[in-house]
């Protein structure tokens, strides 16, 4: 979202800037993990550009990159916002193109369902094999924007659909695409978080893709994805859609490790104090590692 402001020659608002997203946007060519390890750890120390008395410590984790053949079968539910606020060119039209890109990557043993919401929610595509691309593409192409947003009803139906077609040891995931304008029904962030926290115990992850501008609730979408054991990305053009759904498809859709916690211990003879830069909303306490 901050990238959109910068591309438009605008200073992003403070709450749109999350340092970890800036850092993680780029590819650092970290070495792949060896053996059975799911990730490798890379560290780097450099001078601090804004204070010559300080140092910056960069700690990078590289997850194992899976080939298509190594990826487990996917049970995907596309949960798509087709409310009136999604009518802009960079919302529903871009959303369709993005999910058509993803559809091209699907395999025969993958399954896709499509749930939409706008005033009321509905299942517009029952579970369909990933190699039946024409049917999935047609369902996406028929979508039109209109109505108010009843996001909670859509989320509930999406979880019901994902649970009914659950693949044991597979990738069971809801992909919510929206501008975040939940304005009807259960709309407070705390209520949505409680619902998603309850549902994540079913083994279904929730990933969120943000589209558009103006009323897009950036921080809210990140919080919901965090509580849904999923990830979050912002798509503002077709090139970004290719990055998320083609170049980084494995990282977007597949989980290689759960409940990963990182604890850093500094040598007090060399480090007097430190400050965490980025991921401030994920900071853990010592007792969280017990």
Task: Specify the residue positions occupied by each region the protein language model found.
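Exposed acidic/Ser/Thr-rich ligand/metal-binding surfaces
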Residues: 41-263, 268
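Hydrophobic transmembrane signal anchors and adjacent membrane-proximal interface regions, especially
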Residues: 19, 24, 63, 157, ...
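Acidic/polar low-complexity segments with low predicted structural confidence
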Residues: 1-51, 55
């Amino acid at each position: 979202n901050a990238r959109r402001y910068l591309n438009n020659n605008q200073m992003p608002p403070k709450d749109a800037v999350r340092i970890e997203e800036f850092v993680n946007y780029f590819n650092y060519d970290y070495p792949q993990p060896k053996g059975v390890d799911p990730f490798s750890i890379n560290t780097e120390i450099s001078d601090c550009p804004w204070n010559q008395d300080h140092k910056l410590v960069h700690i990078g984790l590289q997850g194992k990159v899976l080939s298509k053949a190594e990826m487990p079968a996917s049970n995907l539910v596309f949960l798509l916002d087709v409310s009136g606020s999604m009518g802009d060119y960079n919302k529903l039209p871009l959303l369709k193109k993005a999910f058509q890109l993803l559809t091209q990557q699907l395999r025969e043993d993958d399954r896709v369902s499509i749930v939409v919401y706008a005033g009321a929610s509905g299942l517009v595509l029952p579970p369909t094999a990933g190699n039946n691309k024409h049917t999935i593409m047609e369902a996406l192409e028929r979508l039109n924007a209109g109505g108010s947003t009843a996001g909670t009803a859509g989320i509930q139906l999406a979880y019901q659909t994902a649970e009914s077609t659950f693949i044991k040891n597979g990738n069971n995931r809801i992909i919510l695409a929206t501008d975040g304008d939940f304005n009807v029904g259960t709309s407070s962030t705390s209520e949505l978080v409680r619902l998603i926290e309850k549902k994540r115990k079913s083994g279904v992850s929730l990933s969120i893709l943000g589209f558009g501008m103006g009323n897009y609730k950036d921080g809210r979408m990140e919080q919901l994805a965090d509580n849904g054991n999923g990830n979050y990305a912002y798509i503002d053009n077709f090139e970004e859609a290719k990055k998320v759904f083609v170049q980084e498809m494995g990282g977007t859709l597949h989980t290689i490790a759960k409940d990963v916690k990182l604890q850093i211990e500094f040598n007090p003879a060399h480090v007097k104090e430190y400050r965490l830069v980025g991921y401030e909303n994920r900071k853990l306490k010592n007792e969280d590692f017990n």
